[in-house]
């Protein structure tokens, strides 16, 4: 019997979860645990995936999970990236490319918070919402955690880590009106409410290392009292580098995991990172698409559990379903052949 679990924050690392248990979110704070079910593709389906960008290793790891699942289940996969956030016109054109290719389902990692005329454009093609929510009525299933939680977990960790000491935090949640930035800020605010942890400023900008580095330098000049940077993985990477130039190194917390953030955890440069297990999410997106195409039962949303990673527990076992292997390069097209399945 499924049990509705209220959000007890230690829950995300509970060993009582089976390795393959999934979460179905009822809202940003409540979820149900559900078992992962076996799956077999009945034929070679054609899936087309859209990402905002592969500049961020978050999407690179998700891409790895997708191509692994495509190989495992014997389906074709085409991948298109928009080159950044707020690229609605580009992604609309890419959906047309997917249709011309003969895609039977769209796996949509949107670069915007809404996707006007999606129903008109995709017609009867199933759409799996990937990571970033667009609240479109025609989307029947979403793969991804509430971004509220990806801000809440780091905020809660900081409050505990500070032991009552005041902290001055710069938030760098990524692009404005895209990628869950607003929800992560809301989650962080909720977590630190009533504590001496204070948000000094919020710096919004695209997930590009130069943009994030310039934002950080501007904010440090404007607010020299900043001692903590909490934000996207790329913001964390910028903060790790900037810390070398300061008398007192910045404390760095990341809202999600990347390869650089993982190295920062191992070296003690990052004190905490949340992980929504991107490789696993890529696999789930392919599985949800196959199920929907085969007329099987599909949950309206599904995600892996969120991991809270620190220098003490950041090891290969904890990240095996989060990060793509070292040296992995983006796969833009995978075509199933009989030889590929052997």
From Swiss-Prot:
What SUPFAM superfamilies does this protein's entry cite? Periplasmic binding protein-like I
Provide one Gene Ontology cellular component.
periplasmic space
Lineage, top-rank taxon, reads Bacteria
Q: Which UniProt keywords apply?
A: Periplasm, Signal, Transport
Residues in coiled coil = none
Secretion signal: which residues?
1-18
Location in the cell reads: Periplasm
The family annotation for this protein states: Belongs to the bacterial solute-binding protein 2 family.
State its role.
Answer: Upon binding a putative inducer it probably interacts with TorS and allows it to play a role in the induction of the torCAD operon for trimethylamine N-oxide reductase.
Q: Report the protein name in the record.
A: Periplasmic protein TorT
Recorded source organism is Escherichia coli O157:H7
